[in-house]
Structure formats: C-alpha cells, structure tokens
A protein has these predicted regions:
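C-terminal-of-GTPase-core extension/linker across diverse P-loop GTPases
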Residues: 2-12, 54, 142-264, 281-283, ...
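Glycine-rich, N-terminal phosphate-binding loop of Rossmann-like dinucleotide-binding domains
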Residues: 22-23, 88-90, 240, 275, ...
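A glycine-rich (often HGG/GG-containing) alpha/beta subdomain
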Residues: 1-146, 150, 154, 324-326, ...
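Inter-motif core of Ras-like GTPase G domains
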Residues: 286-310
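Conserved beta-strand segments of alpha/beta enzyme cores
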Residues: 108, 269-271, 359
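Conserved G/P- and acidic residue-centered "switch" motifs that form tight phosphate/ATP-binding loops
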Residues: 123, 230, 274
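Switch I (G2) and immediately adjacent beta-strands of P-loop GTPase domains
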Residues: 52-65, 69-73, 253-281, 299-302
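Generic enzyme active-site microenvironment
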Residues: 272, 306, 333
Length: 460
C-alpha cells in the first residue's frame, strides 16, 4: 500500500492563501493529528468535498494557524487516493511549520510530481494528460494555456485511443485468422482492413502535422533579429521586451554576441535573439559574433531583417536577405520611421535578384504605437487557434511516438496493398500499437515515466 505523502502545493512566496496537500491511505489519520474542526469533531469524520474551518496544531499542541480543511474520498480525488488539503494563511514560514507537523504525524515529503504520478498510476489520467498538467502550469500565453487545458480534458488522448482501439481490433482478428485457419471465424475483408489503416494513417498524420505550431506555442518561436550594424536591432529587442536588455549606442558593432530574451508579442511567445550586425570584419571577436548570427538565422522560426530607414536609399545586404528567406517566416522591417516618415509610403527597391520578403513593414522603437504594425505582422506569421475539435502536439516525445506509429501504419498499409502475407501486416500494426502504448502510458517504461514526472514541481 502506498504511503501517505505531503507537500506545499502553492508558490514559496507570501500570499493570502497557501495550501498543504496530503494523499494516501492514512490521510485522514494524519489530518486528524493536525487539524481540529471548530465544532470539535474529529477531522477523520469530515464529510468529503466540504470546507471545514478549524485550528492547525503541532504534536505539542501549539497553534500553527487557523485554516480550512477539505477531504476527498478515494476514487474521487485528483490522485485517486484518500486526499486532503489544508488552506492556510500564505506565509512560507507557517506552511513549512504545518508541513513539518504533517511529517511528525506520519506523512512523508512528496517527490516532484508525485501527486500527478499517483493519478496516472491509479488510472485517473494517461501520460498525455499528465504532461498537459505541467504544460498548463508552465503556459506563458493564453493560447498555450487553452491547448494544455484541452489536453488535460483528453483532447489528445481521445484520438489516440480511437486509433489504438481500431488497430487492436484489427490485429486481434488477424491473429484469429492466422492462428486458427480451420475455425469458423469471420474473415477480415480487404476493404475493412484498408479503411482501418487509412483512417488511422489520416488521424496520426493530422496530429503530427500540428507539432511545428505546437512547439512554437509551448517553447516560443525562435526569432532572429538581423541586419547591418547600427540598423536598430538592439533598440527593437529592448522595445519588444520592455526594458534595456541590449546595449544601444551610435557606434556600429556594439553587439558582438547574440543576446536572447523571451517576450509575448501580439499574443505569440517569442524567443528573441538580437544578433551581431552581419558584415565583413577584420575584428576576430566581431567575426565570431557574425558567425553566431548566421547560425541563429539558420535555426530560426522567424527572421526579422532590420534595415535603417533614417536615410535613403535603403541599404540591405543581398546575402542577409537570402539567408532570411530560408526561414519559415521572415519580415523586412524598415527602422527609424520617426526620423524619416516617408518610409511609410515609399516604394523600396531591393537589390537585383534579392528574394521578395514575406512581409514588409516600417517601425520605430521610440514613439507611442511605433511598433504596432510590426507586432500585428508578427501575429500574422503565427495565427492563433487549433484545428477544429482538436489539439496541438507540443513536445518532442509525443511527436516522436506519433511519427513511429504513423510510419508503422503506413508500412502495414503498403504490405497490404502489395499483397504480402498477413503476418507482415500484423508485425507493422503491432509496431504502431507499441508506439501508441508508449505515448499514452499503457506500455511505457518505468524509467521514462519517472523522467516525465521529475519535470514537475513538488506539490503537483
């Protein structure tokens, strides 16, 4: 029988309310040793799901706090076990004292993620839903929170279960036909098998196709800000993050290394990378910075090419444009339009042979509203929303497992089309089942499950 665990479930900072959680078979006994309801009842007799006011005391009878307690019955709690919460005043000192009293009463310190791990082990959620819990906690945008909340509610589990159940039914019937050829067993028709594999392939391909957007949603779009020295790149970074993150001077070449910072811009989480100005240089240190700039562009989801608009003609190096054009999205942003308002309506001539930018916009980093057009353009590059009734894959583990399942289903489909023997189709279909089982936790290895829950905070 699992032991009873305890942890502080709220942030370690002063607040109006702080929560200590308990879970395990001896939860009511531990709670009764700590908490006395105001009406004199034993805490072991509290009705489930109802807040009760009372006093929290340590083993010596000293009052630690006046708090609210609530208990949850096994099978009807987050973990699936007997559980309880003490809602105390949010002093970190008070919460630590209450936690120590819980330990003295027989509970032990919960490991990171152990409450959610118990929920998984007790069948309250699968691995995709458990991972969505930490995604919800870590969400940095409203859209990321909505996607995670939908997955906690089963938005990813449901389509995976449908594919798993369809393939399991298919393989079990295949086994019956292969193992008992003389028995009176209804044969699988080619059309039925074809339909199951086709529908499974379509569902998995659609899910895998969401990973590029999901990765950006969760981790942020790698956004390289590039251009010639002194074009206004660092000023743009500072304006987007809201404080002076990068040094800005009138001297070209001030930024000699990449400077990174996260910011939510137009509802999109960006991992902004201010780069050294790209130019030919004899300075060894600056040359290293330029090389890092090129690498940042090559791995970026979005490239913002900043061109100095304070004077004409516009000067943009063709190799910078060519480099930016390889990115999934890129914007040619004309800076300093407060100094030269004509740039907002000017017709700019790019160097001969230069790629046409996906978006062209002017901006300035000093005037109110000077970034509005650029912010709107960034939002256009990463439209919000998820597929109707669906969700986005957001982590590499899930995407890799879906990819393996998809490849196995395709291989089974190809074997069927080629007229190969049923055992070949079976082998590939079972490979898909293995990948899906690992994804949802049906057949996941213990060490992999442990790594997943180690990412959680203590108390969740």
């Amino acid at each position: 029988m699992p032991d009873t665990i305890a942890a502080i479930a709220t942030a370690s900072a002063a607040a109006a309310v702080g929560i200590v959680r308990l879970s395990g078979a001896e939860t009511r006994c531990v709670l009764a040793a700590l908490f006395t309801p105001v009406d004199g009842r034993s805490a072991a007799e509290l009705p489930p799901r109802r807040m009760t006011y009372g006093t929290v005391r340590d083993a010596e009878g000293r009052t630690l706090d006046h708090a609210l307690a609530v208990v949850f019955s096994a099978g009807h709690s987050y973990t699936g076990e007997e559980s309880a919460e003490l809602h105390c005043h949010g002093s970190p000192v008070v919460l630590q004292e209450v936690l120590r009293a819980a330990f003295a009463a027989g509970a032990r310190q919960a490991r990171a993620g152990e409450f959610t791990e118990r929920a998984f082990l007790n069948g309250k959620m699968d691995l995709t839903e458990a991972e969505a819990v930490i995604d919800l906690i870590d969400a940095e945008t409203a859209e990321a929170a909505r996607n995670a909340a939908a997955q906690v509610d089963g938005a990813l589990r449901r389509p995976l279960e449908q594919v798993y159940d369809a393939l399991l039914s298919l393989t079990s019937r295949f086994y019956a036909v292969v193992d008992y050829p003389d028995e009176d067993i209804e044969d699988l028709t080619l059309a039925e098998t074809e339909r199951t594999l086709t529908e499974s392939e379509q569902t998995l391909a659609a899910l895998l196709g969401t990973f590029a957007r999901g990765r950006v949603l969760k981790s942020g779009a790698a956004t390289a800000i590039v251009g010639a020295p002194n074009a206004g790149k660092s000023s743009l970074l500072n304006a987007l993050v809201g404080y002076d993150r990068a040094i800005v001077t009138d001297l070209p070449g001030t930024t000699r290394d990449t400077v990174e910072e996260k910011a939510v811009v137009g509802g999109v989480l960006l991992r902004l990378i201010d780069t050294a100005g790209i130019r030919e240089t004899d300075d060894a240190v600056e040359r290293l910075g330029v090389e890092r700039s090129r690498r940042a562009v090559e791995s970026a989801d979005l490239v913002i090419v900043v061109a100095d608009g304070s004077h004409t003609p516009l000067t943009v190096e063709p190799d910078i444009l060519a480099l930016a054009a390889r990115a999934p999205h890129w914007i040619l942003a004309i800076s300093k339009d407060d100094r030269n308002p004509a740039v907002k309506t000017a017709v700019w001539r790019l160097p001969d042979g230069a790629p046409v930018p996906e978006h062209l916009v002017s901006f300035n980093s000093v005037m109110p509203g000077g970034l509005d057009a650029l912010i709107d353009t960034i939002g256009d590059c990463f439209p919000a929303g998820v597929p109707a009734g669906g969700t986005l894959l957001t982590n590499a583990r899930q995407a890799e497992a879906v990819d393996r399942a998809l490849n196995a289903v395709r291989a089974a489909h190809e074997a069927l089309t080629a007229g190969l023997t049923p055992d070949v189709v079976l082998t590939e279909a079972e490979g898909a089942l293995d990948a899906l089982g690992e994804l949802t936790g049906r057949t996941a290895r213990e060490d992999m499950v442990t790594r997943i829950f180690e990412r959680f905070c203590v108390g969740k």
